[in-house]
Amino acid sequence: MARVTVEDCLEKLDNRFELVLVAGKRAHQLQSGGKEPRVAWENDKPTVVALREIAEGLVTAESVDNPIADRSADVDELALLTQSFGE
């Protein structure tokens, strides 16, 4: 289980208040089953998974607030996977 720090997350977001809001919204999405995690779950709580996603740059304030932006990120990820498998 990789440790995530606030400093890791603040490199991706403007301030700690935005971090709290984004992490809370993302954790709620994960907990309710509305969204799939973008990192390995590793038996962590949804809040930890949300912070790990933010620290890795996989989740942004825009993608949490705007489901269309989140879907376009999924499409980009799918395109990369398709290219890597040569299909």
From Swiss-Prot:
Pfam families: RNA_pol_Rpb6. The keyword Transcription applies. GO terms for cellular component: DNA-directed RNA polymerase complex. It catalyses: RNA(n) + a ribonucleoside 5'-triphosphate = RNA(n+1) + diphosphate. GO terms for molecular function: DNA binding; DNA-directed RNA polymerase activity. Keywords: DNA-directed RNA polymerase, Nucleotidyltransferase, Transcription, Transferase. Gene3D superfamilies: 3.90.940.10. It is an enzyme of class 2 (transferase). The keyword Nucleotidyltransferase applies. One of its GO terms (biological process) is DNA-templated transcription. It comes from the Bacteria. Its EC number is 2.7.7.6. Promotes RNA polymerase assembly. Latches the N- and C-terminal regions of the beta' subunit thereby facilitating its interaction with the beta and alpha subunits. The RNAP catalytic core consists of 2 alpha, 1 beta, 1 beta' and 1 omega subunit. When a sigma factor is associated with the core the holoenzyme is formed, which can initiate transcription. Belongs to the RNA polymerase subunit omega family. PANTHER family: DNA-DIRECTED RNA POLYMERASE SUBUNIT OMEGA (PTHR34476:SF1). HAMAP family: RNApol_bact_RpoZ. This is DNA-directed RNA polymerase subunit omega. It comes from Alcanivorax borkumensis (strain ATCC 700651 / DSM 11573 / NCIMB 13689 / SK2). The gene is rpoZ.
